Design a protein with these regions (language model features):
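Aromatic-lined carbohydrate-recognition surfaces of secreted/lumenal glycan-active proteins
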Residues: 45-62, 119-126, 150-201
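Aromatic-lined substrate-binding rim segments of carbohydrate-active enzymes
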Residues: 7-56, 141-170
Length: 205
């Protein structure tokens, strides 16, 4: 069972880093009276099933959602590692501290819960962002002679590698997986051109 433990800067477990999602109670940060992730893990294991924590990696939601999270939003706590783009907020894949922030979240889950795996969704750049995605400053600092597209692909790979190594250092038996776009690159045999992992969202994993 893949259980969504993190949505967009809010969570479905007792966290010291990000607030409880309002989905369960109607109020951001309100404890629902039980720990949803702990419940899922326990019930899965009773039935001989694995339980994996599904984590939405980079999207943080729109302005209204981010505002609703208040002071516990990462946009408020660590604005340097976030980017606003098309009325949405994202963790900035090009900032070195982003992978450390994500590792804190993952460590909290892996150390405190008997999960069998951690799964990352939306570990990608917004679709067809091109030069409109405002990461020019980071590219100037950290690009090191690479093209913008290559740098972005490397950023995502570096994040995933860092998280994988961190999980395996804590609990080698915990599985690490991700949800890349299903089509790696365009091919001449198919009519669906332009929507792919490699160019459209800079995934090379």
């Amino acid at each position: 069972v893949l259980f969504q433990a993190r949505t967009r800067g809010d969570v479905f477990y007792r966290s010291k880093i990000e607030p409880f999602s309002a989905i369960l109670t109607g109020s951001v940060g309100k404890d629902p009276g039980y720990d949803p992730l702990a419940f899922v893990v326990e019930e899965c294991h009773k039935r001989g099933m694995e339980s994996h924590a599904w984590i939405v990696a980079l999207p943080l939601g729109g302005r209204k959602h981010v505002t609703s999270l208040g002071a516990r939003s990462v946009v408020k706590k660590q604005p340097a590692i976030t980017i606003s783009y098309k009325r949405e907020y994202f963790l900035d894949p090009g900032h070195p501290d982003t992978k450390e922030y994500m590792m804190k979240l993952v460590r909290e889950v892996v150390e405190n819960y008997d999960v069998d795996g951690v799964h990352f969704d939306y570990l990608r750049y917004p679709e067809h962002a091109g030069t409109r995605f405002p990461d020019t400053r980071g590219f100037r600092i950290y690009g090191k002679g690479r093209s913008l597209a290559a740098w972005r692909r490397d950023n995502l790979t570096d994040i995933l590698r860092h998280l994988y190594k961190g999980v395996k250092a804590m609990k080698p038996w915990v599985k690490v997986s991700t949800s890349p776009v299903g089509k790696y690159d365009d091919t001449s045999r198919y009519s669906s051109q332009g929507w792919n992992a490699y160019d459209a969202v800079h995934q090379d994993v």
